Amino acid sequence: ADLAYLNEEYLSKFTKTGKVDSVIPVQPAYAKTKEVEAYYPVDAGEDCTAKTYHELSIVVGNATDIKTTMALRLLEGVLLESESSPLRRALLNAGVGQNISGSYVGSLLQPIFSIKASGSEPELRDKFISVIYKTLQDITINGLDKKLLEAALNSTEFKMRESDFGAYPKGLIYGIGVMDNWLYDGNPIEGLRYNIILKELRDGLKTRYYEQLIENYLLDNTHKVIVSLLPQPGKEEADRALEVEKMAKLKA
């Protein structure tokens, strides 16, 4: 009845224009890694020591490739999220930052794998990048610790099978899992069919599957950006003065 009312009173008065184009275009890969340097405001006279941020962000794969998405999420945790993580440990030992972290955003059409250093200095950017590449290259040659991978996979499998999502309702998490694929014209049900994928990921522990992912997506892939965020005393005041000047011109 409600739908009929909406149609009779509103929708029927409009002409159907055809199919809505909701396709999100894929961003072409960069020919080479981009570099960005930006500034954030700190108080005038403030000590800027160890207040620089460096980040390497990499576009990796496609959200509709659920197996690869899950595998890269596992890799991010293994490489960066624990005291035993080899990439995190290498960056801390190299002194490129006081804090090292990572993130993996798999809900975008083109997921993003990020490696971050905070509490750093501007001149440490090149060292930050070189340590990342050297460590990842060493891992692809010598192999990733399969015990770390297996532990991460066991934890993921437990959460999925037991619907253990902490304080979050399982229905909400299932809905998000469905939408991550459905939003980009993938099969929504595939986001819930994890048994086969978990088996394939576990089989990958016996091969170079994870090392190959590192090679293909993190090393040989040029769709990357290096971002350095530096402190700039007095920037807030300068930006405010420019905004006041801009508004004055608009009012004139």
Describe each PLM feature range:
Residues A1-K32, D47-D65, A71, G77-A252:
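Charge-rich, well-structured scaffold segments of protease-associated domains
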Residues P41-D47:
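Edge strands and adjacent loops of beta-rich recognition modules
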